[in-house]
Amino acid sequence: MSQNEGQEAGDEGETMGVADGERSQQGQFPIVGVGASAGGLEALEKFFDHLPSDTGMAFVVIQHLSPDYKSLMAELLSKHTKMKVMRAEDGLPVERDEVYLIPPKKTLRIFNGRLLLEEQESRGGLNLPIDIFFRALAKDSGELAVGVVLSGTGSDGMRGVSAIKEAGGMVMVQD
């Protein structure tokens, strides 16, 4: 990983020579970050139930998971969409009409349309994976960034939502 890739998502300036929102100016497709708490499976299922399989967008699901939990999310969500659902892998390019899931014990970012996985840092129990991804998404996709916050508790996602709005992207929050 280069020196700049390790910057905190949402830092000012350029990263590896790519200005904020440059990817969106190159005619790329929208990338939708979907944040949900550990109990948000039902909301996620309903969300994907109502989407066509050919949206032309990519979806990245950031869900709070217990580090010791073996997630069956890919299998469960596959029953609610015809899009390909898979666990995110480091360096994986994001493609249209696919759903990517954050693995347990990982932090997920996006840079130049590729997913970047890192070991989750222990910050005294404070982990904000939705904020981290949304801020990176805003920086990478600019006005094509979309943030969706589903059922949850706490403030995870608030800073990321602000970053997406500031980048000209769109934000939706479940009541």
Explain the meaning of each model-derived region.
Residues 1-175:
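Conserved acid/base catalytic micro-environments in cytosolic active-site loops
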